Amino acid sequence: MWRVEFVACLRPSCQFCTAMCSILSAGRAWRMMNFRQRMGWIGVSLYLFVSAAAFYYVFEINETYNRLALEHVQLKPQEPHRGTTWTHSLKARLLSLPFWLWAALFLIPYFQVFLFLYSCTRADPKTVGYCIIPICLAIICNRHQSFVKASNQISRLQLIDT
């Protein structure tokens, strides 16, 4: 039964076989890369691995964390005492910020670093860093200014009718 399924899988249009062939030929592709690209792929791999480990650590469901979270939710909000330090009041204000703001504060830099590492895997070294927001905005503005400059120069040309 397994052998029949495997033989049927050897068709050229099979996605599994295509993926396996690409994995087997990855050694050849790895040798064709330059040092910067190899380091870029290693950086992307390590970045994703560390991100997965941190995600697992932060969002791991554990009885201790659940108990502490339930105790925190069940506590009645208390008015700040006169003896409360500025760090406690700052912590209380920061924790009251909405989730979307916290997500944006962490995800935008996270994706910027990931996209920069991914851009290091490109063959053309001139394209490294184009995905970083300030660089991208500078390139777009520069292109717009050069387009306006070129269109002004074209409009100044005199047409010669022959």
Swiss-Prot record:
GO terms for biological process: lysosome organization; regulation of vesicle-mediated transport. It is a multi-pass membrane protein. Belongs to the LYSET family. It comes from Xenopus tropicalis (Western clawed frog). One of its GO terms (cellular component) is Golgi apparatus. The keyword Membrane applies. Required for mannose-6-phosphate-dependent trafficking of lysosomal enzymes. LYSET bridges GlcNAc-1-phosphate transferase (GNPTAB), to the membrane-bound transcription factor site-1 protease (MBTPS1), thus allowing proteolytic activation of the GNPTAB. GNPTAB is involved in the regulation of M6P-dependent Golgi-to-lysosome trafficking of lysosomal enzymes. LYSET is thus an essential factor for maturation and delivery of lysosomal hydrolases. Disulfide bonds: none annotated. Keywords: Golgi apparatus, Membrane, Transmembrane, Transmembrane helix. It is found in: Golgi apparatus membrane. It comes from the Eukaryota. This is Lysosomal enzyme trafficking factor. The chain crosses the membrane at residues 39-59, 97-117.
